[in-house]
């Protein structure tokens, strides 16, 4: 087992490693995937174990600090998205259209059952009873009509919004990869 800490990219990177192992002949069958629970990311009180001396101590958001902030200049990773937008000339309208189409495709896939055979429902017992999860809740939360009205998320005069960037949520997926031989 290997742990990969790449925030949203961890699962995809695990699948890439699995592919590489099969291609190299190190494995014939690999289970690869990832999970994250961003809603459970803690806040950190740095230096609390060794003793905070006189004065105040800063509390850090672990989710932002450990994965969504550039360690060198302390800028949000969203700012780098804005730099790519500027470099490649993506307009706000293009980003909004892509976000809307992405959500619509996800909704269409859910409604048609396109991936139903590939999804294993997960049931969680709560005080209020069992809750079954068998589809991504995120696409249904989006009001496609509001996408063009959203404010920029990372720069005051930016073009990337909550609709055209990754959401903060929890999720998990696993795939079985195998060699044809």
Language-model regions, residue ranges each:
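Short secondary-structure boundary/hinge segments and terminal tails
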Residues: 9, 39-40, 48, 103, ...
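Conserved catalytic cysteine-centered active-site region
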Residues: 1-29, 71-77, 141-167
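Short, well-ordered secondary-structure micro-motifs
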Residues: 14, 41-43, 131-135
